[in-house]
């Protein structure tokens, strides 16, 4: 979901717009192209994330459990690899100069954070659809724009 995308952006090192060197990526993930190690894998050499990130969700359960069947594991692995701390079943209580006060499993706890990014819900906004229909323009309304909620890429592809 959007929280995973934002967390991945936040842990990324600043970029000059150039693709990352292949050797760096291979070392980070422990890929041995020389096949000098069994299975072509060596000990990963993770890079240091640009910042410490918490990924919190109100829904009970592990964050990312509802990510896509074919690629969700990659997103979860990437955030774990970058030491993103993930909690589900979180109740948000307060944001102030001390950070973010949350409650998890009945226990309150302060997270010392400098910034809070809220990635919460969406509501369909169909005013443009109505005006385009009035002008007899052809359009397609698919995915999260058609039905707000959990994004389902397969559904969006089928729809348009």
Model-derived segments and spans:
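A short, gly/pro- and small-residue-rich
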Residues: 9, 13-17, 130-143
